[in-house]
Amino acid sequence: MKNEDLIERLFGGELPPYPSFKEGIRRAPHRESHLSEADMELALKNALRYIPKKHHEALAPEFMRELKEHGRIYGYRFRPEGELHGKPIDEYEGRCIEGRACQVMIDNNLDFDVALYPYELVTYGETGQVCQNWMQYRLIKEYLKELTQEQTLVVESGHPLGLFRSHKFSPRVIISNGLMVGMFDNQADFNRAAALGVANYGQMTAGGWMYIGPQGIVHGTFNTLLNAGRLKLGIPQNEDLTGRLFVSAGLGGMSGAQGKAAEIAGAVSIIAEVDISRIMTRYEQGWVNRYTDSFAQAVEWAKEELAAKRPCAIAYNGNVVDLLEYLIENNVHVDLLSDQTSCHVPYDGGYCPQGITFEERTRLLDEDKETFVKLVNKSLVHHYELICELDKRGTYFFDYGNSFLKAVYDAGVKEICKNGVDEKDGFIFPSYVEDILGPQLFDYGYGPFRWLCLSGKQEDLDATDRAAMECIDPNRRYQDRDNYVWVRDAKKNKLVVGTKARILYQDAMGRMKIALKFNEMVRNGEIGPVMLGRDHHDTGGTDSPFRETSNIKDGSNIMADMAIQCYAGNAARGMSLIALHNGGGVGIGKSINGGFGMVLDGSERVDTILSMAMPWDTMCGVARRAWARNENSISTVIEYNEANKLTDHITLPNIACDELVKKTVKEFNK
């Protein structure tokens, strides 16, 4: 393969017509960059690297116009015509099954029904992109067609570096996104790098090519709400949230799961969302039952459903701060309260401040960023004040890992910090991982395992649902019972958006058992090939002190060793696709997060990889949590060591006596 032939084939012919944009499809707002003229020249040269010189004169002004109007060069002209969908794998070209499978995943991430801003390659989370521009998309797709089982495709922040010789037990694709050098690992430098075309914000499963629609977070949200009810509201383990009110904000790519998860958990929910198009998406999918722009109507509906003990998801089209004011003024009791606005990028459109409409937010981002930032800070401070008032009235508030509390701190509220000074010791309100998901799920190894049926057939998804259910013992732990019920009812709950996929929280041994069963089913011709994966938001996949590792209390919550070891270990053991990103769901410099994809083709080679990689991917996180003295992780490691004593051994801590430690420190500080 010659480079000039490859580039000529993709970009050298007659330029495709500049596309028209389908009405009703959301578009990304202008992105911040603050480039100098020299930077603009660099951005232009960087984009033109993909294009044969004969087209430079025509495309240079076009790319420059995109940079000025959008803050980024997207190369819209090179987007394929029409809508993209994750098609059945047999409809893709490729020299190996992994190359074709990755094409399914990429196109599913950019489906109009799935992606937040599909024309700008944003899958979810306001800024989470598959890659930076449509030239990269075309080149990645071409490399995936050429990829063999003796090669690995390397992708750096959306740029396909090339194909490199490897072997059958190597990853077929290795991805990294936004990994900044420490002194430049901040939002301003990232924005500049992204505008230059050298950095991509992959979020988690956007740039990791593993998004399965908002279903991917429904199970985690369901678990969080259910366990919040058990731990904070005194609900028995065999009951749900019937008769309870949950209030939150956001109905986007990830936050869109909130209403559906609350409904499955039995609750009544009111979810505020400023963008009516996102509400209509969830309403048409059946993920919210009703919508209104009236406070009184939303509350009236909620009271009716609470009295009837019926679950119901209500979308309120308006600002959550206004909604909370109304609830307080009218003495409406809220049982559970959270927020899922995109506060990892509050000043880039992720948080719409009180007092302006969604349309005004977009205009201010383009025309008056300074005013917008002031409005965001003012709104966040008041939002915090309202949460404090509801907390006094008996509401349980938790940060849903979207950097909301950090955004409040950045807006100038120092009293939100436990130490009253800075964020090093955490915040006065817990994150959902710190209080709920960490100790109840992650510490045992339960996390967001998922699979996608590459055939695109409903019968394959039905068969895998049944097989997964057979692998779960509902009497082992209450978590297993919850997971059993989840997958049993998954089809009835109509969770699929995009390709035929399923999310199912499982622990290390559960994941391996299900994975091996699926591969056996592929081998026997019972189902077509399957792509396994998980969210980066998992037991061992992410280091993030404000979210995934917020219940790590030995001081190592600020370290990123675990996520990197998890990523490297998955590469060493032969996972089909591995990804490592900066920022996750909390923002640049606040997280290092990784994930994987594993194609099940029915081979014994895949059985071997699964037997090594699946336990590692989860237990590397449980091991770190056990070393941090987390009790549930210690008991899980003891069980694992005993069950795997011929092959594995995880180091366990000796627990020091608190009185001895305090006495010793005091004596030396007299």
Where are the language model's segments positioned?
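Glycine-rich beta-alpha junction loops
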Residues: I276, G318-V321, Q340-V345, G401-A407, ...
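Residue-level detector of anion-binding/catalytic polar loops
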Residues: V268, H333, Y396
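Long, compositionally biased, glycine/small-hydrophobic-enriched stretches that function as flexible linkers
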Residues: M1-P214, K369-K517, M521-G533, T539-D543, ...
